[in-house]
Swiss-Prot record:
Enzyme Commission numbers on file: 2.7.1.39
Protein name as annotated: Homoserine kinase
Keywords carried by this UniProt record: Amino-acid biosynthesis, ATP-binding, Kinase, Nucleotide-binding, Threonine biosynthesis, Transferase
Pathway: Amino-acid biosynthesis; L-threonine biosynthesis; L-threonine from L-aspartate: step 4/5
Keyword Nucleotide-binding recorded: yes
UniProt GO BP: threonine biosynthetic process
Reaction(s) this enzyme catalyzes, per UniProt: L-homoserine + ATP = O-phospho-L-homoserine + ADP + H(+)
Assigned protein family: Belongs to the pseudomonas-type ThrB family.
Top-level taxon of the source organism: Bacteria
Entry GO MF terms: ATP binding; homoserine kinase activity
Hydrolase as UniProt keyword: no
């Protein structure tokens, strides 16, 4: 969440006329991230997030905002889009679609432990099941077709070894995506970007017996319909790794995956292709980070991510991937 489009006080005052949210108390840009312009907005009626969508179109946006509303209605803690005075969930600001959503309670946990991974695993499975009857369909826009389109633009900037890995893994994933087993994998709406900084935790009540309480998932603007296992792989590749080496932390990975299975057990096809999907999840973010690093857009507040992080993860997943952990029936 960077700031590509600046919003002045007069811009904000004009925009807020379309909302019944009271008077503005505070407003500031959010510097992290790379896709949209985001701002914390505090009014006399509560705390919110204003997002200006830099790439998503008005035709694409209903998928994301309606998905958040659908999930919230099924008990999944996500930001709730705030309707404007005309009932619409978004409008136009500086010629771009923009929306206001409620701000979740809690803070990101950037050094998660087993207890955090358990909470994330269970809620991710609940989210997947809650999305099964969501009527809108839109593919993950950062999947295989996007890789195939953008890798050629990246390869002039990278080393020979990196080019070999980019092109070799792309061929591997194209074969996997074209297989009968891939077609048989279950799926539906996925977050597709459930990193540590897109999940909030709040203090658990003393009488719950839990050390932490999940506050919610947010930043659904990379969401799309995909295989659920891809969403799990993306999550594990961030929540359950040594950040310096990319090596999986077995304790955290097992905790997240076992917790997920208490809600939705994995299929035989998913178990066979866990390695392929972990590689796909790493490849997706390596490609996008390379693209943003070498072909950046202008932004007022932009902190590009290190592409080497996901290169290390991809190489590690190719070399070593444990099987999905089993779970006893009694734990279901």
């Amino acid at each position: 969440m960077a700031v590509f489009t600046a919003v002045s006080d007069s811009d904000l005052a004009q925009w807020m006329r379309h909302y019944a949210l009271g008077d503005v108390v505070a407003f500031r840009g959010i510097p992290s991230g790379i896709e949209n312009s985001n701002f914390f907005l505090t009014t006399t009626r509560g705390e919110y997030v204003l997002t200006i969508f830099e790439k998503l179109t008005a035709e694409q946006l209903p998928f994301y905002l309606d998905l958040m509303r659908h999930l919230a209605g099924h008990g999944v803690p996500v930001p709730d889009p705030v309707p404007r005075d005309d009932g619409a969930l978004f409008g136009t600001l500086h010629g771009k679609p923009a929306a206001i959503v409620t701000k979740l309670d809690g803070a990101a946990e950037l050094a998660p432990g087993v207890e955090h991974c358990i909470e994330v695993g269970q809620m991710l499975a609940r989210m997947h099941l809650a999305g099964r009857d969501y009527p809108r369909r839109q593919p993950n826009l950062r999947s295989l077709p996007w890789w195939q389109e953008n890798v050629p633009a990246i390869v002039p900037f990278v080393t020979d070894a990196q080019r070999a890995l980019l092109e070799g893994e792309l061929a591997h994933q194209a074969r996997f995506f074209g297989s009968e087993d891939y077609a048989a994998l279950p799926g539906g709406p996925c977050h597709c970007d459930l990193f540590r900084d897109n999940v909030l935790f709040a203090h658990a009540a003393p009488d719950t017996g839990h050390a932490v309480r999940l506050g919610g998932f947010f930043d659904f603007y990379f969401a799309g319909c995909d295989k659920w296992l891809f969403d799990v792989a993306v999550t594990v590749n961030d929540w359950c790794v040594d950040l310096a080496t990319g090596v999986l932390d077995t304790a955290r990975a097992d905790a997240l995956l076992r917790a997920y299975q208490t809600v939705r057990p994995f299929t035989a096809e998913e178990r066979r292709h866990w390695s392929d999907m972990l590689r796909a999840g790493a490849y997706r973010f390596w490609v996008s980070r390379l693209y943003d690093f070498y072909l950046p857009r202008a932004a007022e507040m932009l902190k590009p991510h290190d592409p080497g992080h996901f290169e290390r993860i991809l190489r590690e997943r190719i070399a070593h991937t444990p099987a999905l952990p089993e779970i006893q029936t009694a734990c279901n």
